[in-house]
Regions:
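N-terminal loops that bind phosphate or other acidic moieties
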Residues: 1-133, 137-377
Length: 377
């Protein structure tokens, strides 16, 4: 009997690998002789680096980078076990959490540090880069990233524009002749779960700018600057990026990644499923177990349990979901591949207690799930 265990993390409690370990321990109490394959998952957001590194036997390497407002911080690159792939999170260098609430101003914040993370990955010799772009503090269209990688964003007088969303107001030309040549051989996959265009009422500035500290007046200015940026990209490369689905992700980072670096935007869970070759493992499995900290009606929108379930259902495999808690509206997940879902909190307890005892509670619950599964046979 082969059982594939492919959960996401339980946020603020257990990493995806720790959840997988707990599920395995619970099942082994009933089915000690089964073959267990553990694939810690993620959906492209927080924890993706850790999950992919854990699943492939890789390592996380520290990198000093430039934070959104120019100070230095410790970022990181996840080098996967094959040594040819790396995964980075934009938030590690350009994240909103790196800027104090009273200092958040997307006219000033820059994605320069994300470019430094990419350079660090190139120095490691990688040929394939997975980039998560959630949680950014920036609205510069990825201009800072391009500058860090050697691109020149110039004013009419030939001088470089300032870093940040405001600098784009003076952009006249884009010169990519100085880009790091190794980028030409780098495959870049971007975990992107939004379809917002670059500009307009559904664009980066209008939708996400206020979350990053933009006032209504700033939103107007930022949107105009990104429009100018897109025009310069079209002039330099002949590529239209304003209306590309996902171009507005991460303050316009999607536009730079696709338009200037030739990256591909894909749902985060799809990237992780492909990177870990989940389909190959579930093809001959008897049972697939997934999960995350909370299963509710939003789980069907790009979250790990549904991604895993849909993959498993391609092969007709039964899928069980394990969660910290289930909401009243979670029943919708049964229409998307999860055959049964179980909450691990077994009595009234405070949130801190639930987080602290998550591993034990998972094992207790899963042991009973395993017993039920054994009865069916």
């Amino acid at each position: 009997m082969k059982i594939v265990i492919a959960p996401d993390s339980f946020k603020e409690s257990l990493s995806a690998m720790a959840v997988a370990d707990a599920i395995e321990a619970g099942f082994k109490q009933v089915l000690p002789n089964a073959t267990y394959v553990k694939l810690p998952m993620a959906d492209g957001g927080e924890g993706t680096v850790q999950s992919l590194v854990d699943a492939t036997g890789g390592r996380i390497l520290p990198v000093e980078v430039t934070a959104p407002l120019g100070n230095k911080v410790q970022g990181f690159v996840g080098l996967l076990g094959d040594g040819e792939r790396a995964v980075i999170e934009m938030a590690a260098a350009s994240g909103i959490h790196l800027v104090a609430p009273e200092q958040r101003n997307p006219l000033l914040t820059s994605s320069f540090g994300t470019g430094e993370l990419i350079l660090a990955a190139l120095e490691m010799g990688v040929k394939h880069l997975i980039l998560g772009i959630g949680g950014s503090a920036t609205n510069d269209g990825g201009a800072g990233m391009i500058q860090a990688l050697g691109g020149k964003l110039l004013k009419a007088d030939g001088s470089a524009i300032e870093l940040g969303g405001a600098g784009l107001a003076e952009l006249a030309t884009i010169d990519l002749s100085g880009l790091d040549p190794r980028l030409g051989e780098l495959v870049i996959e971007v975990a992107c779960d939004v379809n917002n265009p670059l500009c307009g009422p559904k664009g980066a500035s209008a939708v996400f700018g206020p979350q990053k500290g933009a006032t209504p007046e700033m939103v107007v200015e930022l949107d105009a600057n990104l429009s100018r940026y897109a025009d310069c990209i079209e002039q330099a490369l002949g590529k239209q990026v304003k209306d590309i689905p996902g171009a507005g992700a991460a303050g316009g980072m999607g536009a730079a990644l696709v338009g200037l670096l030739g990256a591909e935007l894909k749902p985060g869970i799809q990237i992780v499923i492909e990177a870990l070759k989940l389909a190959e493992e579930v093809a001959d499995a008897d049972l697939v177990i997934t999960g995350e900290g909370r299963i509710d009606s939003q789980t069907i929108h790009g979250k790990t349990p549904i991604g895993v379930a849909r993959c498993a259902k391609q092969f007709g495999k039964p899928v069980i979901g394990i969660s910290g808690c289930l909401t009243d509206d979670c029943g919708v997940v049964h229409d998307h591949g999860l055959d049964a879902v179980f909450a691990v909190v077994n009595r009234a307890m405070s949130l801190p207690e639930a987080l602290e005892s998550a591993s034990t509670n998972i094992q207790l619950t899963v042991r009973n799930v395993a017993a039920l599964y054994q009865l069916k046979g």
